[in-house]
Every structure is written in structure tokens, then in C-alpha cells.
């Protein structure tokens, strides 16, 4: 019951905050979380795992049926794309499983990045057509480099570092709830300079500003929320 109440609050916050919009000098990069079916298969009659389970504990005690952990980026990882501009606007969305493609990046930024903005990115090939299709100036930071003149992606890397550290507190989040956690952290970042009393006031008002009609059974049957 506590999970469902918390989920309704986060649903309402997500609806209130929205995906967002960035402009000016923008940094963007993706980060990854392991695909998790936590909460789906326990006592479930209709759920089937799409892979073998990951088991914990000493290697000698692990089952032969355990799925080997893949190296690099695989379909068992969820890509979360984040973008931040210099005025503090944030976009943080689940975009795909595994390696992202141009169509995923295009879907995220369509209608959400101002024309004539400068987008600082890494050398991933998925960004290659953004400058022509979105009328933005692309500044690529090559692998192994920290900056390119005045351009860098240190703010977005720092955001990802804080996000991962914060997510460690939850010991694994089911992928079907991951979008809400991205918005929860986004909310924390947007109002991190507020005093605690103001944060409580904002949380109360904003969580009631948008109506969420999600029922308990909807949480159990929820699908991951990709942009």
C-alpha cells in the first residue's frame, strides 16, 4: 500500500513537471540502468522472464541457470537520456533498451530544444544528424577529452554521478517504475536550493496540481514509460 501511495504522488509530480525544454548552451548524454523485472514475477501467473535471472552471492553458490552478465551495452540495459542547459532546465527520460539510435535521440529532442541552441555531446554517432534536422550547433567532445574550447559535458556527467549515487539508496528499482524515479531526482535537482519548508510546500502543492487516476492493480501491471 505504501508503494502504491508513493507511486501516485510520483505519478502526479511527473505529470506536473513534464518532460521539459532546453535552450541556449545545452549538455546531453545518456546513462544506463540494468533492466529489472523486480516485482513482476513474484506470485505472478502471467509473467514470463525474457532472460535468465541474475543471482547474488558467492560464485560457487550461484545457479547454473543464471544469466551471465553481458559486457558492454546490451538489450538488458535501459538507456536514460539527460540534457541540461545553463539556466537549470532538465530533461531526463527513458529512451530505449540497449544502444540508442538516431531515431531515439530525435524523438526525445523533437519540440524540446530551442532553435539555434548549442548542444554539447560526446562522439556517439546517434547525434550526427541533429545539427541539420534541429537547426542547432553541435559541439562534439571527443573521447578522452574533457572540453573543446569553452564547451564541455562536465555538468551532465556530474548530474549522472549524483543520480547514480542517489539511486544506490534503493538497492535496485524495477524498470516499470524507473521513469518516476528519474522525475523524483529531477524534482530534487530543480529545487535543491530551496529550504526544507519550501520543499515541503512545493511537494504538497505540485503533487496535488495534477490528477493521477492510477489504481493499485495498475501499478502491478505497469509497463516501463519510454519517451
Which residues does each predicted region cover?
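Residue-level recognition of single "structural anchor" positions
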Residues: 1-227
Amino acid at each position: 500500500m505504501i508503494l502504491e501511495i508513493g507511486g501516485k504522488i510520483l505519478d502526479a509530480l511527473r505529470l506536473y513537471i513534464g518532460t521539459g525544454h532546453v535552450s541556449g548552451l545545452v549538455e546531453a548524454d545518456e546513462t544506463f540502468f540494468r533492466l529489472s523485472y523486480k516485482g513482476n514475477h513474484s506470485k505472478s501467473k502471467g509473467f514470463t522472464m525474457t532472460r535468465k535471472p541474475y543471482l547474488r552471492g558467492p560464485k560457487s553458490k550461484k545457479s547454473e541457470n543464471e544469466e551471465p552478465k553481458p559486457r558492454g551495452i546490451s538489450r538488458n540495459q535501459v538507456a536514460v537520456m539527460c540534457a541540461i542547459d545553463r539556466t537549470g532546465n532538465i530533461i531526463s527520460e527513458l529512451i530505449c533498451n540497449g544502444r540508442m539510435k538516431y531515431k531515439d535521440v530525435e524523438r526525445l529532442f523533437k519540440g524540446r530544444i530551442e532553435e539555434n541552441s548549442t548542444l554539447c555531446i560526446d562522439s556517439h554517432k546517434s547525434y550526427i544528424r541533429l545539427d541539420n534536422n534541429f537547426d542547432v550547433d553541435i559541439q562534439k567532445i571527443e573521447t578522452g577529452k574533457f572540453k573543446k574550447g569553452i564547451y564541455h559535458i562536465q555538468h551532465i556527467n556530474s548530474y549522472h554521478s549524483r543520480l547514480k549515487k542517489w539511486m544506490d539508496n534503493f538497492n535496485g528499482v524495477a524498470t516499470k517504475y524507473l521513469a518516476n524515479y528519474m522525475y523524483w531526482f529531477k524534482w530534487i535537482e530543480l529545487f535543491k536550493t530551496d529550504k526544507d519548508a519550501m520543499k515541503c510546500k512545493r511537494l504538497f502543492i505540485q503533487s496535488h496540481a495534477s490528477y493521477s487516476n492510477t489504481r493499485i492493480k495498475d501499478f502491478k501491471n505497469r509497463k516501463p514509460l519510454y519517451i
